[in-house]
Amino acid sequence: MSVMDDAQILWDYHQMHHEPRNTDIAIGLGSHDIGVAEHTADLYRQGRFPLIVFSGANAPTTVEVFPRGEAVHYGERAEQLGVPDTAIVLEEHARNTGENFTLTRALLEREGIHPTSATIISRPYQQRRAFATCQQLWPELDVICSSRPQTLADYIASIGDRDRVLNMLVGDTQRIWVYANQGFATAQLVPDDVLVAYERMLGRGYALRILPE
């Protein structure tokens, strides 16, 4: 199989394929991908939720593109697309997916907001990890995952860096079991074809995002 065949297997695995429905809030997870903010705005305009929390400070990969922080730039983009500022809450301190949820929860509690359901909006290949992390850290929250509908080829074209996307895919796959083993996320079934594709991509050198195990 080609590297793109293997990447497609990982890409399909990470997406939860949840049916969209109305929820109390949206949580837009910060990253290098402004498409998260744009998709969140699309769903808001469809009436899927009345309140958006954009969560994220900076990672080393986002400082240049979002110098004032991921949440700030996401909020500005959503406003440009017609979301009123009164519907946007910014959580500007999270530096990882776990903090996206713990700090968002704490912020909402301080504001007297107690959601029972949420739409988690992320990069397409972050869906499963975000879902597992939220299940572990905020188990009473009823969540669905959503991302801008894109093929892998279209997503790579939108980011403009194939190797970066493929390295992120491999790294996020490994994090499914590493974070579960560390207690940061719930365990997720990893099918054999996903493990085989992951190992083949590692063998092809896509290891820049691999964690020590």
Language model feature labels by segment:
Residues M1-D5, I210-E213:
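Short, low-complexity, intrinsically disordered N-terminal peptides in bacterial proteins
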Residues S2-L169:
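A structural signal for short, hydrophobic/glycine-enriched beta-strand patches
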Residues I159-E213:
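A conserved mid-domain beta-alpha-beta active-site/ligand-binding segment of alpha/beta enzyme cores
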